[in-house]
C-alpha cells in the first residue's frame, strides 16, 4: 500500500475517534457517580482541581511531543490512558476509604493527561492526511462530519448513560431472575466508556503517521513550545483588548463550569429521577445547535464588552435561580447556566481570533485555554473548601450554602471587572 493510500483513511478514523473519545455515557451522572462510590461532594470538587491542574501542566509539552514523537504516538497514548482511567473507576471499591480516593485521584489525573495528549493531535493528523490540492475544502467537509457525529454521539451517550444508571429502569426490561443491583447499574455507564476506550485504541493503532514533522529533539521542542507560550501569554496580558476579554471571560467561565461538573448532584438535590439526567444533558447538547446562531447575531450587533456583560447577566440570573434547590422549577435556571457557557465561548473565541494575527492565533487560543483551566481549578478549590467548612458536613445543606455564597462573590467580581473592562476598551479606542 502506497503512502497516500495508507493515510487516506486517517480522516475517517479521526471522525470515529473524536466521537467515541468525547461522547461518554457517564457525563450526565458524573458527580453522583463519585458520590455513590463513597466520596463527599467537597472531595469530588477537589478532584476537578486535579483534572484542571494536569491539563494546565501538560497541555503545552504534549503539543511539542506530538510534533517530535508523532501525532499517532500521542493519540495511541491518549487511548491507553483512557483505558486506564476507566479501569480505575470501574474497579474502585465502593466506600473504600483511602483506596477509593486514591483511585479517583488517579482517574482524574489520567483523564487530564489523556485529554492533554489528544488535544489538537487528532485534528493535526487528519488535516495532514488530506490531499494538498483542495485541503481547505476537504477539511471543512471532514470537520463538519466530525461535528455531526459528535453531536449525535453526545445525545445518544447522555440518554443511555442516564437510563443505565437507574437500576429501576434497567430491571424493567430484564427478567426478574436477571435483576441487577444499584451498585452494578452504577458501573454500567463506565463499562460502556471502557469499551469505547478500547475501540479508540484499535482506531489509533490503525492510523498512519503522514509525515515526520520535526527533526529537532523532544527536549528542544518542549523548551521551544514553552518559550512560545510564555511569549504569547505576555502578549495576551499586555494587549488591552485580549487581556480584558480573557480576564472577564475566565471569571464567568470558572463559576459556570464548576456548576456544570456538579449538575447531577444538583438534579438529585431538587428531586429529579436519575433516569432523566441524560435527557437534560441531551437537551443541552441540542441547544448547542441554536446558541451559536444567537451568539453570532448578538456579537454582530453589539460590541465584545456588551456581550460579555450579557453573558455575566445570564450567569447571575442562573446562579440566583438555583439557590433554593428545593423545587423542580430550579431546573430552568440550571439549563440557562449551561447554555451561557456556549454563548460565552463563542464571544471569547470570536474576539481573540479577531485581535490575533495568524502567526500566533493558535497559541493565543492555547493560552486562553490554560488561563481558563487555571481559573476553573482555583475556583473548584475554593468551592470545595466552602463545602467542607459547613458545620453539617458536605451534604445538601452545605451545597445550598455554597450556591448561596457564590452569587454575591460572582456579582462583585464580574461587576468590577466589567467596569474595568469599559475603562480598558475606552483606552483602546482612544489609542
Model feature map: region roles:
Residues 1-11, 207-247:
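Juxtamembrane intracellular "pre-TM" segments in multi-pass secondary transporters
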Residues 13-30, 47-64, 73, 103-168, ...:
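Substrate-agnostic recognition of the 12-TM MFS/MFS-like secondary transporter fold
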Residues 26, 33-43, 172-182, 266-276, ...:
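Short extramembrane helix-to-coil loop segments that connect adjacent transmembrane helices in Major
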Residues 68-79, 299-313:
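Cytoplasmic membrane-interface "Motif A"-like loop-to-helix N-cap segments
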Residues 80-98, 104, 313-326:
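C-terminal ends and interior cores of transmembrane alpha-helices
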Residues 165-195, 385-414:
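A membrane-interface helix-boundary motif in multi-pass transporters
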Residues 170, 182-186, 190-220, 419-431:
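Helix-loop junctions on the cytosolic side of multi-pass membrane transporters
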Residues 305-348:
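C-terminal transmembrane helical hairpin of 12-TM major facilitator-type secondary transporters
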Amino acid at each position: 500500500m502506497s503512502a497516500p493510500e495508507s493515510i487516506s483513511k486517517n480522516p475517517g478514523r479521526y471522525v470515529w475517534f473524536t466521537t467515541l473519545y468525547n461522547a461518554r455515557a457517564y457525563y450526565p451522572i458524573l458527580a453522583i457517580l463519585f458520590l455513590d462510590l463513597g466520596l463527599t461532594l467537597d472531595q469530588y470538587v477537589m478532584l476537578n482541581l486535579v483534572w484542571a491542574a494536569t491539563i494546565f501542566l501538560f497541555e503545552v509539552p504534549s503539543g511539542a511531543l506530538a510534533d517530535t514523537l508523532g501525532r499517532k504516538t500521542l493519540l495511541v497514548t491518549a487511548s491507553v490512558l483512557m483505558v486506564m482511567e476507566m479501569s480505575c473507576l470501574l474497579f474502585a471499591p465502593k466506600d473504600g476509604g483511602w483506596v477509593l480516593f486514591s483511585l479517583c485521584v488517579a482517574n482524574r489525573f489520567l483523564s487530564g493527561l489523556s485529554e492533554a495528549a489528544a488535544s489538537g493531535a487528532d485534528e493535526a493528523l487528519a488535516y495532514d492526511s488530506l490531499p494538498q490540492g483542495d485541503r481547505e475544502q476537504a477539511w471543512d467537509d471532514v470537520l463538519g462530519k466530525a461535528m455531526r457525529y459528535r453531536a449525535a454521539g453526545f445525545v445518544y451517550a447522555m440518554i443511555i448513560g442516564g437510563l443505565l444508571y437507574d437500576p429501576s429502569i434497567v430491571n424493567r426490561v430484564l427478567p426478574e431472575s436477571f435483576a441487577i443491583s444499584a451498585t452494578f447499574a452504577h458501573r454500567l455507564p463506565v463499562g460502556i466508556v471502557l469499551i469505547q476506550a478500547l475501540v479508540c485504541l484499535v482506531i489509533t493503532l490503525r492510523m498512519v503517521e503522514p509525515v515526520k514533522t520535526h527533526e529537532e529533539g523532544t527536549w528542544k521542542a518542549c523548551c521551544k513550545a514553552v518559550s512560545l507560550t510564555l511569549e504569547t501569554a505576555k502578549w495576551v496580558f499586555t494587549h488591552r483588548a485580549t487581556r480584558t476579554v480573557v480576564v472577564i471571560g475566565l471569571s464567568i467561565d470558572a463559576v459556570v463550569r464548576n456548576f456544570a461538573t456538579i449538575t447531577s448532584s444538583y438534579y438529585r438535590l431538587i428531586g429529579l429521577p436519575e433516569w432523566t439526567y441524560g435527557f437534560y444533558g441531551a437537551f443541552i447538547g441540542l441547544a448547542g445547535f441554536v446558541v451559536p446562531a444567537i451568539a453570532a447575531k448578538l456579537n454582530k450587533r453589539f460590541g465584545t464588552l456588551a456581550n460579555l456583560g450579557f453573558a455575566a447577566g445570564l450567569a447571575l440570573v442562573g446562579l440566583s435561580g438555583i439557590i433554593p434547590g428545593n423545587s423542580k422549577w430550579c431546573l430552568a435556571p440550571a439549563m440557562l447556566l449551561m447554555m451561557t457557557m456556549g454563548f460565552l465561548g463563542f464571544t471569547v473565541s470570536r474576539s481573540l481570533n479577531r485581535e490575533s494575527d495568524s502567526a500566533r492565533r493558535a497559541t493565543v487560543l492555547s493560552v486562553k485555554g490554560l488561563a481558563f483551566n487555571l481559573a476553573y481549578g482555583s475556583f473548584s478549590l475554593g468551592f470545595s473548601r466552602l463545602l467542607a467548612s459547613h458545620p453539617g458536613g458536605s451534604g445538601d445543606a452545605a451545597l445550598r450554602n455554597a450556591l448561596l455564597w457564590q452569587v454575591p462573590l460572582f456579582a462583585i467580581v464580574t461587576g468590577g471587572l466589567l467596569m474595568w473592562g469599559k475603562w480598558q476598551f475606552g483606552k483602546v479606542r482612544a489609542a
